[in-house]
Amino acid sequence: MRGSKILITGATGQVATPIALALAADNEVWGAARFTDPAARERLEQAGVRCAAVNMAAGDFTGLPADFDYVLNFAVAKSGRWDKDLAVNAESAGLLMSHCRGVTAFLHCSSGAVYDPPDDEPRTERSVYGDNHTPLLPTYSISKIAGEVVVA
């Protein structure tokens, strides 16, 4: 992909950061995150990513352009608080889709955590949903399932 204007949310995350860095070489990439770590922001900016501090839980995209070609939504919350995790993992995806309604494509990154654990069987898109992260992250699976419903 070259010459596109791309928004990447959760830009400081382990999945989004290498994608943002790679795409910034040939595109106008905007990275949205809380940017609580100044070094993470600096690394992205040095690669040419335009960084915008955004609190996805608040659903406020003021100051963030809407004229992107593509949105890659990698934002995630695993706080254990239902209000925050549903706001970030589900509600904000819908609000962001509305804010950037003219995009060519909106990629929403979900998680294998949305599936019911099938023992040793491989998972597919048709696998049954389930709350398989309850012991470790009690809000994660359900809030990610909610996000899939919002963007469907």
Where are these regions (language model features)?
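Active-site Tyr-X1-5-Lys
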Residues: P135-A152
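Conserved Rossmann-fold NAD(P)-dependent oxidoreductase catalytic core, especially the SDR/UDP-sugar
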Residues: G94-T139
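NAD(P)H-binding glycine-rich loop region in Rossmannoid oxidoreductase-like domains
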Residues: V49-A90
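N-terminal Rossmann-fold cofactor-binding loop
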Residues: A32-P38, N55
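Conserved catalytic-core motifs of eukaryotic protein kinase domains, centered on the activation segment
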Residues: E42, K78-L86, P117-E121
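NAD(P)-cofactor binding segment of oxidoreductase domains
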Residues: Y70-V71, G80-H108, V150
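SDR active-site strand-loop-helix element
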Residues: T9, A32, V71-F74, F106-G112
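N-terminal Rossmann NAD(P)H-binding glycine-rich loop of SDR-like oxidoreductase domains
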Residues: I6-A25
